[in-house]
Amino acid sequence: MNSNALSLLGLCRKANKLSMGHDMCKGAVTSAKACVCLVSSDSSERVYDEFSSLCGSKNIPIFRIEPTIDEIHHLIGYKAGIITIDDGGFAKSFMKNFKEYRPGEETLYDK
């Protein structure tokens, strides 16, 4: 994963544009506040499947990212296996720096 994308997560945290942890992320997704959902590499398949169906129903992209829960903790200062970016501008910037970025998806983050 691109280091610029990772550093952007810290910036999102400081700007209070991240939801972190299962319950906060579930609320952000169900209220359609989330623009992108990110699941750590060591989170369970059950969590990924749960959020995959939730995000699919709200047309919110979801990605499994390389950092582990501990690495995310080091980046944002909060131990969470799942996070959402809740700002369209930050989501676009993250996706431009994200290794698996797919052209054309930027229209999904105009919330």
Predicted regions and their residues:
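N-terminal positively charged helical leader segments and presequences
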Residues: T30, A34-S52, P61
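C-terminal structural segments of small proteins and small subunits
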Residues: H73-D110
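Charged, alpha-helix-enriched surfaces in structured cytosolic catalytic cores
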Residues: N4, R46, P67, G89, ...
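N-terminal first-folded block
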Residues: N4-V39
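Mid-chain, well-packed structural core segment of small domains
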Residues: L54-A80
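Short, flexible, solvent-exposed loop/turn segments with mixed acidic/basic and small polar residues
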Residues: L6, K26-G27, F51, D70-L75
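Conserved catalytic alpha/beta core of Sir2/sirtuin-type deacylases, generalized to analogous enzyme cores
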Residues: M1-S3, A15, P103-E106
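Short, ordered loop/turn segments at secondary-structure junctions
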Residues: D23, D42, P67-D70, G88
